[in-house]
Regions:
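Outer-membrane beta-barrel transmembrane strand signature
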Residues: 41-68, 73-83, 152-192
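Transmembrane beta-barrel domains of bacterial outer-membrane proteins
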Residues: 71-75, 79-82, 87, 99-104, ...
Length: 265
């Protein structure tokens, strides 16, 4: 099917869920044990399982589509991809977009061969800031507390006397995001000057940027905290290669000359 554009697609879909949780006291069991042992507790009258409150069913999907075609002297391929991953914890997810293009063209009866390519991607993550505090708090936080904010103060109820234990639902409102954007291009020109002599010119450019942002409200961090940062990187590469290969009687000559320049910022 030379000369005709063909299309290929593949995709997948999945679900992830928590298999097992730590066995902790429910609100009713907590009250019962406290009553039996004569222990005074702060009872807000609820029966909340905070481990399950911060969990979700994570949906996962992948999609990839490609367009390609060509002939004996020219060919091309363009592809697009998308990946979406939800974690089993609220507000934990990853998205990735990719694109790729390659083209090859031969001209002048094989004297000149041109190859061009470009790749780009965008990766976005929403992360959990502190795994230890999140899961420790979910397992040990007072189960008589509600699973919603105080309607009067519009804030999460906390326990000021508890060390390293914060309302786990407050951790779900923390923002910790990072995004990575990447693009790379290249070009290769091959000149078949003679049967034995070949000249190759190659150039490539890469650009990468990483952005980080974080926001911790006062409900989980004493005075609150906010951060935003950006890191950029550029790379430029170029080289020229001349090769000569020749067989003569019982001998074989293979000569290579190479010049290269690279710059990174």
């Amino acid at each position: 099917m030379q000369g005709r554009t063909q299309v290929a697609y593949n995709g997948s879909f999945g679900i992830s869920t928590v298999y097992k949780n730590l066995k902790m006291l429910s609100g009713d069991e907590f009250r019962s044990v406290a009553s039996e042992r004569g222990i005074s507790i702060l009872d807000k009258g609820n029966n909340t399982n905070f481990q399950k409150e911060i969990q979700q069913t994570g949906l996962q999907q992948n999609h990839h589509v490609a367009f390609y075609g060509g002939s004996s002297t020219s060919s091309y391929r363009v592809s697009l991809g998308f990946m979406d991953r939800q974690g089993v914890i609220l507000n934990e997810d990853m998205k990735n977009f990719t694109s790729n293009m390659n083209m090859n063209q031969k001209m002048f009866d094989g004297f000149f061969d041109c190859e061009l390519g470009m790749f780009g991607s965008i990766l976005k993550n929403h992360n959990l800031v502190d795994y230890q505090k999140t899961f420790y708090s979910a397992a040990t936080f007072n189960p008589t507390y509600p699973n919603h904010k105080d309607p009067v103060t519009n804030s999460w109820d906390g326990i000021t006397t508890a060390s390293q234990i914060t309302n786990p639902l407050a951790w779900m409102q923390v923002d910790d995001d990072d995004a990575t954007s990447h693009i790379s291009t290249h070009a290769r020109f091959t000149f078949n000057l003679m049967k034995e002599l070949k000249l190759v010119l190659f150039g490539a450019y890469t650009y990468n940027i990483v952005e980080n942002s974080q926001y911790l409200p006062t409900s989980v961090w004493a005075n609150g905290q906010a951060y935003k940062g950006t890191k950029k990187m550029e790379s430029l590469l170029g080289n020229m290669m001349l090769t000569y290969k020749k067989g003569w009687k019982k001998h074989f000559f293979d000569v290579l000359a190479l010049a290269e320049l690279q710059k990174e910022t």
